[in-house]
């Protein structure tokens, strides 16, 4: 079973994302900021990270840059899931090493499609 780390400062978003991912046969864990997510990745690397942009302590971009620097390459797959939907944010995310980008609000079909596109389903 593949594992996805859900990183968002909103408990509601984490809960909704986990339900969707559970329905897609993923095991899940969660973090409420990038710093906690990075610590979890150091302990046990997930197959995927569903990542918010704006979070306290360490935002999504800072997390992604640190993660890619530590592990190199394109693993785990990182999919941003955020309200930041302008071209500048999308470009920054992809340049930092994101594999995909989802805009909130999201539903099961969008998550499933993006996870298929990056080879997780």
Each language-model region and where it sits:
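Active-site beta3 strand of CheY-like receiver
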Residues: 44-50
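Receiver (REC) domain active-site loop signature in two-component systems and cognate sites
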Residues: 55
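A Lys-centered signature of the CheY-like receiver
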Residues: 104
């Amino acid at each position: 079973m593949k594992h996805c780390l859900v990183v968002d400062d909103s408990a509601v978003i984490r809960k909704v994302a986990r339900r969707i991912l559970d329905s897609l046969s993923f095991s899940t864990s969660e973090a409420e900021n990038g710093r906690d997510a990075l610590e979890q990745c150091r302990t046990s690397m997930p197959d995927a990270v569903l990542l918010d942009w704006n979070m306290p302590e360490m935002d999504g971009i800072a997390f992604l840059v640190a993660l890619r620097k530590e592990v190199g390459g394109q693993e785990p797959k990182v999919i941003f899931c955020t309200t930041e939907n302008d071209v500048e944010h999308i470009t920054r995310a992809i340049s930092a090493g994101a594999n995909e980008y989802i805009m909130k609000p999201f539903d099961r079909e969008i998550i499933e499609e993006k996870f298929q596109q990056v080879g997780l389903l």
